[in-house]
């Protein structure tokens, strides 16, 4: 009987020795699984971020892609506006069709610019200077005005959607009191 018991004890001990390497292997596989899961989740997050970035870039390209063209058209707008401002009543009467053509061209240019999100910034004399939308071309003391008030508007400014395309050029009062 002693002989029967001895081999059984050895057999019992042998599985315990083989279980330890299996446990180590199981832990290794779990760690590898966790690492792969983490890498997979990071890859998913990167893909989602890339998709969002591409969507944002596409939207910005749609909104602001014509910025350079719009900026190049602003002198045309300015010149048409100036031509109408300086035309005297006699010139308007003598060249009514020409003046009407310039007015229609300017109106159409405004409509096209508006359609593409280009909007004028039209400060008025007496408004407060806003450095986000205005460019001070000069400062001068003017009686009856406060420092920082607009005293002259030289050119309109323009926004394209929510971005400044060109600041309005203005003269600003430098008075320290009212």
Curated annotation (Swiss-Prot):
Task: Give the GO terms filed under biological process for this record.
Answer: protein folding
The cross-references to PROSITE patterns, in alphabetical order and at most eight, read: GRPE
- GO MF, one annotated term: protein homodimerization activity
Q: Which InterPro entries match?
A: GrpE (IPR000740), GrpE_coiled_coil (IPR013805), GrpE_head (IPR009012)
Q: What is its main location?
A: cytoplasm
Write out the biased-composition intervals (Basic and acidic residues).
1-11
Localization recorded for this chain is: Cytoplasm
Q: Which residues cross the membrane?
A: none
Task: For this UniProt record, give its keywords in alphabetical order, as a comma-separated list.
Answer: Chaperone, Cytoplasm, Stress response
Record keyword Cytoplasm present: yes
- The record's region (Disordered) falls at 1-30
Q: Look up the record and report any one GO term of the cellular component aspect.
A: cytoplasm
One short Pfam family name for this protein?
GrpE
Its function?
A: Participates actively in the response to hyperosmotic and heat shock by preventing the aggregation of stress-denatured proteins, in association with DnaK and GrpE. It is the nucleotide exchange factor for DnaK and may function as a thermosensor. Unfolded proteins bind initially to DnaJ; upon interaction with the DnaJ-bound protein, DnaK hydrolyzes its bound ATP, resulting in the formation of a stable complex. GrpE releases ADP from DnaK; ATP binding to DnaK triggers the release of the substrate protein, thus completing the reaction cycle.
Q: How does it assemble?
A: Homodimer.
Q: Which PANTHER family match?
A: GRPE PROTEIN, GRPE PROTEIN HOMOLOG, MITOCHONDRIAL
The text of the family note is: Belongs to the GrpE family.
Protein's UniProt name: Protein GrpE
Ranked from the top, the taxonomy reads: Bacteria, Pseudomonadati, Pseudomonadota, Alphaproteobacteria, Rhodobacterales
């Amino acid at each position: 009987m002693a002989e029967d018991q001895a081999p059984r004890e050895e057999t019992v001990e042998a599985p315990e020795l083989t279980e330890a390497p299996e446990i180590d292997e199981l832990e290794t596989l779990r760690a590898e699984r966790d690492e792969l899961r983490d890498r997979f989740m990071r890859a998913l997050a990167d893909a989602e971020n890339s998709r969002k970035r591409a969507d944002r870039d596409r939207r910005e390209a749609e909104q602001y892609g014509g910025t350079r063209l719009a900026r190049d058209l602003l002198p045309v707008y300015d010149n048409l506006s100036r031509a109408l401002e300086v035309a005297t009543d006699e010139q308007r009467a003598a060249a009514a069709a020409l003046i009407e053509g310039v007015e229609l061209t300017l109106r159409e240019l405004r409509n096209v610019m508006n359609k593409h999100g280009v909007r004028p910034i039209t400060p008025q004399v007496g408004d407060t200077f806003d450095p986000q939308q205005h460019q001070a071309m000069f400062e001068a003391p003017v009686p009856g005005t406060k420092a920082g008030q607009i005293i002259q508007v030289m050119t309109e400014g323009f926004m394209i959607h929510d971005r400044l395309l060109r600041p309005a050029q203005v003269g600003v009062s430098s008075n320290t009191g009212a």
